[in-house]
């Protein structure tokens, strides 16, 4: 009981320190990991200007994320009313006011100190099923929060129990870890672990309370020569062809690398039917589809049917190799190129399933995955063509 009280008192002290932060500037390294991997899937270095924003009842903070190597280059901005997303390749800046496809929360990754503050506040006040641990590691304290609920818990400002998707996500346990520096009793590193995805953020060069929210104006960071567009227009204007417009057309040919970095061509495959699955490491629906796809591969002979996955998110051969090994894939997985994503018109979204007949005509296109429904749809389409 004494140890628990001491833990609680220390966390309250850290929370008080976090609540005193009106503004913070810092460099942050954000890593994305797959459970079981020994190397990060992606690593991003950013410079952050974070402001406490009591006027914003959703996230409770405003911030701008800039490229760590070029702090004039905007990566993301949120001011409590809008988020700004730059598309550097075509010099567009999308402004989202959250009225398009509204959700119960704002889909904004909270900045470091806002996130840490809400994690600790939740740990001290929640009635959810949680287990906490505080450990002295010399120069820092290590804090671990394990949330054992029927839904995963994410923080967009306060904690939200995430709606369960129409597929099995595995464990719904959520784990949050903080490393707290003893010199200032503030976190400098955090880790979030879900069944499908792990993210780690590490801060450096912290400066606190040099500015206030009144110094912050989002438009100061907008690139001057970019066209400003509404976020909703990026979706509404889709007069461009979509993947389903390929039905009845010849499947675009490709030569892509496998996990041994060897070239593989669509023309190499001689089976009657081919299922091409555009997938993404870190995509929950894609991972949920794997048991069915493995079973599907074993249900037909190689003369009848072939299954090829094309990894369109990570583009790192080592990550794809680890993924194939960890998931014990019994089918080929290839590394996508921008060209093949463009040809198949997926826009980088996943999962997509293209069912291709013996003449290599695309006969069916399915987007997304929902356990039994998608399984039946794919099996029926294959059997019809056989």
Regions found by a protein language model. Name each.
Residues 167-174, 183-254, 260-262, 269:
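Non-transmembrane domains of secretory- and envelope-associated proteins
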Residues 3-52, 126-132:
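N-terminal leader/targeting segments and the immediate start of mature chains
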Residues 287-327, 336-343:
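Structural microenvironment flanking redox-active thiols in thiol-disulfide oxidoreductases
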Residues 270, 278-295:
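Conserved redox-active cysteine motifs that mediate thiol-disulfide chemistry
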Residues 113-183:
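Extended beta-strand-rich segments in extracellular/periplasmic secretory proteins, especially
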Residues 52-113, 199:
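An acidic-aromatic
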Residues 325-329, 335-381:
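Thiol/disulfide oxidoreductase modules built on the thioredoxin-like
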């Amino acid at each position: 009981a004494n140890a628990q009280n001491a833990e609680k008192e220390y966390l309250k002290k850290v929370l008080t320190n976090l609540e005193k932060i009106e503004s913070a500037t810092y460099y942050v390294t954000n890593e994305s990991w797959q459970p079981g991997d020994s190397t990060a899937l992606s690593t991003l270095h950013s410079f952050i200007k974070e402001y406490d924003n009591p006027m914003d009842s959703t996230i409770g903070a405003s911030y701008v994320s800039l490229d760590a190597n070029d702090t004039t280059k905007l990566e993301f901005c949120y001011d409590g009313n809008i988020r700004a997303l730059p598309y550097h390749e075509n010099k567009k800046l999308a402004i989202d006011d959250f009225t398009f496809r509204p959700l119960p929360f704002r889909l904004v990754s909270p900045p470091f100190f806002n996130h840490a503050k809400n994690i600790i506040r939740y740990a001290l006040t929640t009635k959810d099923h949680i287990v906490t641990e505080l450990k002295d590691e010399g120069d820092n304290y290590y804090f671990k929060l394990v949330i054992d609920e029927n839904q995963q818990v994410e923080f967009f400002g306060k904690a939200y129990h995430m709606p369960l998707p129409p597929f099995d996500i595995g464990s719904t346990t959520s784990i949050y870890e903080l490393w707290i520096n003893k010199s200032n009793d503030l976190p400098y590193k955090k880790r979030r672990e879900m069944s499908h995805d792990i993210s780690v953020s590490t801060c450096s060069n912290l400066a606190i309370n040099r500015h206030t929210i009144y110094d912050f104006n989002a438009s100061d960071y907008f690139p001057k020569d970019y066209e400003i567009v509404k976020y909703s227009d990026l979706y509404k204007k889709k007069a461009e062809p979509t993947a389903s417009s390929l039905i009845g057309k010849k499947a675009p040919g490709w030569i892509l690398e496998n996990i041994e970095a060897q070239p593989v061509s669509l023309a190499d495959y001689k089976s009657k039917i081919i299922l091409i699955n555009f997938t993404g490491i870190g995509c929950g629906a894609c991972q949920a589809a794997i048991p069915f796809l493995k079973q599907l591969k074993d249900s037909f002979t190689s003369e009848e049917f072939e299954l090829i996955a094309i990894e369109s998110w990570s583009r790192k051969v080592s990550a794809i190799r680890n993924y194939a090994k960890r998931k014990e894939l019994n089918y080929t997985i290839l590394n996508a190129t921008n060209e093949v994503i463009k040809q198949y018109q997926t826009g980088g979204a996943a999962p997509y399933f293209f069912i291709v007949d013996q003449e290599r005509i695309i006969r069916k296109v399915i987007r997304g995955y929902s356990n039994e429904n998608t399984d039946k749809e794919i099996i029926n389409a294959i059997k019809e063509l056989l």
